[in-house]
Curated annotation (Swiss-Prot):
Needed cofactors: heme
Taxonomic lineage of the native organism: Eukaryota, Fungi, Dikarya, Ascomycota, Saccharomycotina
Compartment list: Membrane
Membrane-crossing residue ranges in chain numbering: 18-38
The keyword Membrane belongs to this UniProt entry's keyword annotation: yes
Binding site for heme: C473
Record's function text: Together with an NADPH cytochrome P450 the enzyme system catalyzes the terminal hydroxylation as the first step in the assimilation of alkanes and fatty acids.
PROSITE patterns tied to this protein: CYTOCHROME_P450
Main location: membrane
Gene Ontology MF, one: oxidoreductase activity, acting on paired donors, with incorporation or reduction of molecular oxygen, reduced flavin or flavoprotein as one donor, and incorporation of one atom of oxygen
Protein name, as recorded: Cytochrome P450 52A5
Length: 526
């Protein structure tokens, strides 16, 4: 009796201790969760993941590795390096932890198709709104559901053929770009930096009705007409800083709130003040004023649909991110690869010469939306750059309910894999676009000729540079048209394009909301 009493007292003594209660609760939770997952797999017809990875630190180590690789320009390629190291590399899908929470990563085209299209309603943007909203607010890139549908319906007409086809509006900005290139004759310079200034100039003219004219500076004997706009001098730097910060918040996933520094908040305020200037200017116009405006202005068309300054600012900033960065990044990679491949330049110039002329014989007036679409080799060059360097190399979605992905489970990796409600699925089109099983042994080689081969024309979901499904990029034709026009004009005007042959290849990449060259596009061009 005494022995039983002693045991009872010992149990009562220990069972109330936190160091007993907590581990016991975890064990009980894990047991219940294990059987719950088994029941879900059985109900949904899913198998055990073929590849389950761990970093050995319950997922606490990986975010710091990613932050480090982001700083040295290797985070994008890190997404590829992990797949050959999987236990079953032939199955390009795996489960892994971040901060003890299990995520799924995939580059399988069938899984990407499911996420973006066939099972679209099973997935949402998850925490993306919380990651990005401090800078770009509630817009097409941050909203789900009814809010997203409303934004898309509002914006779709603004990217109709008649709005994106006016390539002649680009020519004044191209002429200023020429001045910067000519001043560097015989010297190496960063073309990427100029492309980002060029696209912010053209994008703000399209969006706001007047360009910020960032290219017009004292180095070429020009001044910007917008220099007196309050905050204009700080805008570009603040915009760049905030975008870089947002990329870091995305890495932190549900712990994004840890990153909310003072400078980030200050830069957001600068960007908002800049956009608000143009929004207020548009709101001050009467209906009669809007009707009398010559030419197309994105903001003025939006004002006809809503007069809510917050909505207008958010939509403008959402589109500005895409309108500036996507095209600037694409052009930077195009000229980086052209400078490395003189044979490609020769073929491209032959096509341009035939269609539009070169040098003093250039027939600029013949360069139109329609004629650019007929330049097959130019399209192949752009497609090859979008394949190797997609503007948004990595993305994620979050399951809105317990569901599956078509592949990634079982011994052969061909069975469905369970995705639990609230679970994040990462997908890397950058890695998908470089799969040897799809593109052959030369998958990492820049070779535009592949786009004339029958196999490449049947890629389906193995080539998604502008996303796919209901959320496919509205502005893709805008970006392609602008990139095509600028490429043609630069190759018409300049005969020499070279790159330091000792430059690191493959290049390091910078990942903000979109991808660009970490070390710039340093070329000689004259």
């Amino acid at each position: 009796m005494t022995s039983d009493s002693t045991i009872h007292e010992l149990i009562q003594s220990y069972i109330t201790k936190w160091y007993v209660i907590v581990p016991l609760a975890i064990i009980i939770y894990k047991v219940f969760d294990y059987f719950y997952v088994l029941s879900l797999r059985k109900r949904l017809g899913a198998a055990v993941p073929t590849n389950e990875e761990t970093d050995g630190y319950f997922g606490f180590h990986l975010p710091f590795v990613l932050m480090s690789k982001k700083k040295d320009g290797t985070i994008i390629d890190f997404s590829i390096e992990r797949y050959p190291e999987l236990k079953h590399p032939e199955t390009p899908t795996f489960e892994f932890p971040i901060f003890t929470v299990k995520l799924i990563s995939t580059i399988d085209p069938e899984n990407i198709k499911a996420i973006l299209a066939t099972q679209f309603s099973d997935f949402s943007l998850g925490t993306r709104h919380a990651h990005f909203a401090p800078l770009i607010g509630d817009g097409i890139f941050t909203l789900d559901g009814a809010g997203w549908k409303h934004s898309r319906a509002m914006l779709r007409p603004q990217f109709a053929r008649e709005q994106v086809g006016h390539v002649k509006l680009l020519e004044p900005h191209v002429q200023v770009l020429f001045k910067h290139i000519r001043k560097n004759k015989g010297r190496e310079f960063d073309l990427q930096e100029l492309f980002f200034r060029f696209t912010v100039d053209s994008a703000t003219e399209f969006l706001f009705g007047e360009s910020v004219e960032s290219l017009r500076d004292a180095s070429i004997g020009m001044t910007s007409k917008s220099k007196d706009v309050d905050g204009i001098e700080d805008f570009t730097g603040a915009f760049n800083y905030s975008q870089n910060y947002l990329a870091s918040r995305s890495i932190m996933q549900q712990f994004y709130w840890i990153l909310n520094g003072k400078k980030f908040r200050e830069c957001n305020a600068i960007v908002h003040k800049f956009a608000d200037h143009y929004v207020q200017k548009a709101l001050n116009l009467t209906e009669a004023d809007l009707e009398k405006q010559a030419g197309y202005v994105f903001l003025y068309e939006l004002v006809k649909q809503t007069r809510d300054p917050q909505v207008l600012r958010d939509q403008l900033l959402n589109i500005l991110v895409a309108g500036r960065d996507t095209t600037a990044g694409l052009l930077s990679f195009v000229f980086f690869e052209l400078a490395r491949n003189p044979d490609v330049v020769a073929k491209l110039k032959d096509e341009i010469d035939t269609k539009f002329g070169l040098g003093e014989d250039a027939r600029i007036e013949e360069i139109t939306f329609e004629s650019l679409k007929q330049c097959e080799y130019l399209k192949a060059v752009l497609n090859e750059c979008l394949r190797l360097y997609p503007s948004v190399p990595q993305n994620f979605r979050v399951a809105t309910k317990n569901t599956t992905l078509p592949r990634g489970g079982g011994k052969d990796g061909l069975s469905p894999i369970l995705v639990r409600k609230g679970q994040t699925v990462m997908y890397s089109v950058y890695a998908t676009h470089r799969m040897e099983s799809v593109y052959g042994k030369d998958a990492t080689t820049f070779r535009p000729e592949r786009w004339f081969e029958p196999e490449t024309r049947k890629l389906g979901w193995a080539f998604v540079p502008f996303n796919g499904g209901p959320r496919i990029c509205l502005g893709q034709q805008f970006a392609l048209t602008e990139a095509s026009y600028v490429t043609v004009r630069l190759l018409q005007e300049f005969s020499t394009l070279t790159l330091d042959p000792n430059l690191e290849y493959p290049p390091k990449k910078m990942s903000h909301l979109t991808m660009s060259l970490f070390d710039g596009t340093n070329v000689q061009m004259y």
